[in-house]
A protein has these predicted regions:
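Glycine/proline-rich loop-helix segments at beta-alpha junctions forming the active-site rim
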Residues: 2, 108-192
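Membrane-associated lipid acylation/remodeling enzymes share a hydrophobic transmembrane-juxtamembrane segment
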Residues: 69, 73, 153-154
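Active-site and ligand/interface coordination hotspots across diverse enzymes
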Residues: 1-71, 142, 146, 187-192
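Short secondary-structure capping micro-motifs at structural edges
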Residues: 32-35, 61-63, 80-92, 138-142
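Short loop/turn segments at strand-loop or loop-helix junctions that form parts
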Residues: 45-53, 101-112, 156, 181
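Short, surface-exposed acidic-centric catalytic microdomains
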Residues: 72-119
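A structural preference for short, hydrophobic beta-strand core positions in alpha/beta folds
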Residues: 30, 101, 176-178
Length: 192
């Protein structure tokens, strides 16, 4: 499930973020158009993450959306600062642009466990690569084409970033940065 988490308002030299407490799901129509609440999404900024983890599902197993828990909290706290110091801030036109959170693989590769480090991280990465190479990469490209983004920012974890880079680096205004979960360390607060 991909979601709009807010809007970037571009006015001159500074981009401000309007965030919502509620995120809005993106629907992909059969004609290749991405919509939110029945309206076409125009010129969004797309943030690529890896796959949904345990925090992104409710107690009954229904998806809540990308970037929940620490990742979402750090994204909310630092994204405005980082987007304003990135190369993306120089290329997006004036106006409002939706910020769309996209999991590159739509399946829970962590299998209900916290993929922090060690064996859980390794198993999660192996599962992600299996899914990505078995059609997840094609699905990601279809969703990005439907969104027709003004910019794409790859914030996948380091171990998976290269796989995603190889598939989507041809999109205009493509850049990358560190995963939001690592943004609590100042040296990792960066979007190129």
């Amino acid at each position: 499930m991909d979601q709009i988490c807010g809007w970037i308002d571009v006015n001159g030299n500074y981009n401000s973020i309007r965030k919502w407490k509620t995120k809005f799901n993106v629907d992909y129509l059969s004609n290749g158009i991405a919509v939110c609440q029945g309206k076409a999404i125009k010129s969004p900024i797309v943030i690529i993450l890896e796959s949904p983890h345990v925090d992104e599902f409710d107690a009954s197993g229904m998806p809540k959306g990308p970037a929940q828990g620490k990742t979402g909290n750090r994204f909310d706290k630092y994204f405005e600062q980082l987007i304003n110091s990135s190369s993306v801030s120089n290329v997006i036109g004036t106006g409002s642009h939706a910020v769309v959170l996209v999991n590159s693989v739509q399946y829970q590769c962590s299998l209900g466990k916290q993929p922090l480090k060690g064996k859980n991280r390794s198993n999660c990465d192996k599962n992600w690569k299996l899914c990505f190479n078995a059609g997840g990469n094609t699905d990601l490209i279809k969703r990005l084409n439907a969104l027709n983004p003004i910019a794409v920012i790859n914030l996948c974890t380091a171990s998976l970033k290269k796989d995603v880079d190889q598939q989507i680096c041809h999109f205009s205004n493509y850049t990358c940065g560190y995963h939001p979960a690592s943004w609590h360390w100042r040296k990792y607060r960066k979007i190129q």
